[in-house]
Amino acid sequence: MKKLNTIILILLGMICTQLYAVQLNSIYPLKPNDSEAFYFTPENYPIKADGKMDVSDALQAAINQVKKEKNFGILFIPEGKYKISKTIYIPTAIRLIGYGKNRPEFILAKNSPGFQEEVADDKGKAKYMFWFTGAVVKEGEKPRDAGASTFYSAMSNINLRIEDGNPHAVALRTHFAQHSFISYVAVYIGKGKAGLFDVGNELENVAFYGGDYGIYTTKASPGWPVMMVDSYFEGQRVAALRCQESGLAMVNLYAKNVPAVFDIDPNYCDKLFLENSYFENVSGPAVVITNENNSNNQITFRNVYCKNVPTLAKYTRSNTATHVAHKIYKVKSYDHGLQMDNMVDMPEYETLVDIEPIQKMPVAQLMDIPAPVSYTHLRAHETLRH
């Protein structure tokens, strides 16, 4: 009987993993041996990965050490729970990468100082767990936000958690550019504000639970579009994503139990492209378009599967909406913006919708690349140098 229960649990886990588009396991189960990297371990820094000791200062010192000694590089974070209570600044070209059987988790402690009130002079009106910056932030200095010249910064295979008593906490601020990314990160926002403010370059296999928003964002750094692949949003109180001029391109997004999936800021436009994605239990409109019939709007959905989503879109200026009577349906295509039938036609503002009812939600796409079983440093192979 015990064996049967174990098999059932494994099967249920496989179903949940496949259904929700993201993987929550550690993708680096083994320690990468890299002579050029730094390791955030008790042997190297005065820390304990027990979730009780505050490692904020030690973590910031380790990140700054990588920047000072190498200018660019990796700080590897072993499996464990790491308590922090202040903003950690990650300068240009520094990457935090977790490893171990389970992903390491950084936890913002309950009632951490400064996370209770809105930060009026901050762009995101919030305080951040991790803020990607353009340079090392010295004590007493105002941070210089990451921008169009912030390359190679990243966080991967690490989970983040916001504990109670931090209503204006946001886990990540990521306004970086080329070769920068957030990947294999699950953010447990709880009663905090959001998982991420200001998107940058690429997000892959990211999950957001709770919060007012999973992501809220303005436009990306100048010249750099943003791609988000394999993402999951659940239980946000206002919207999965709040955006203005974000220019997001998204594939394999799953949003569940939210009032709205996309909420475009009042009087702003956006260019959103969404493909092969899933909406489930959306109580309000899936997308709120606040500035309809504007040439800067390009809202495009392709192959989006919906369950319990009675309103696909709301247009606030005209107080109209695109309603769908089917309980489960496929949005073969949805286009809002300027439309042309051919290259010589005059463009017109239109909303084009092609929907068909379906019997059940399909299984979400799942990455089938296996976890690594070994790690090889290229510099160890002398023949590759010639």
Cite the ranges covered by each PLM segment.
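Extracellular "leader-to-stem" segments immediately downstream of a signal peptide or signal-anchor
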Residues: 4-6, 16-76, 84, 89-164, ...
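Short amphipathic alpha-helical "recognition" segments used for binding
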Residues: 6-7, 386
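Hydrophobic helical h-region of N-terminal Sec-dependent signal peptides
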Residues: 9-13
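A short, hydrophobic C-terminal helix/tail in secreted or cell-surface proteins
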Residues: 380-386
